[in-house]
Amino acid sequence: MPLVNGRFVADMKSPRTPDNEEPAAERACDFRPVDKGFTEEMALAEAERCLNCKKPFCVEGCPVNINIPRFIEQIREKDFGGALDTIREDSMLPAICGRVCPQENQCEGKCIRGKKSEPVAIGQLERFLGDRPELASTPVSYTHLTLPT
């Protein structure tokens, strides 16, 4: 990725990484999830597409204000544990939000890349990390929670 004015800049021509879906013939025979989520290689390729904007509108589009540029940069650096920790600073549900959050109207809807081409697949990157809790440098503790009586 080229360095311009002290910032890494992505190639605008790189296409969005397609979803990792079960082939139709296979999914017709079972009840496994259709979308298998990104592999590590797919996540790294998609993270390279981030423009590292000076004013990250994607964060403004996120209802919980996740530091999206930082976690994508950490994915790019293969610091998956750090990326998951970054998300968990604001959201403890990356695996769920990566699947059900309406990213097309929120973070991805605000992505600058989406003005000229397809936005970065922020939801898929979040899901990639959320599906791998063992990568976190700090394990999640729920001991502080109390059940209602």
Regions flagged by a language model, labelled:
Residues 143-149:
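Conserved small/polar residues in nucleotide/adenosyl-binding loops
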Residues 1-141:
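Ferredoxin-type iron-sulfur electron-transfer modules and their immediate structural context
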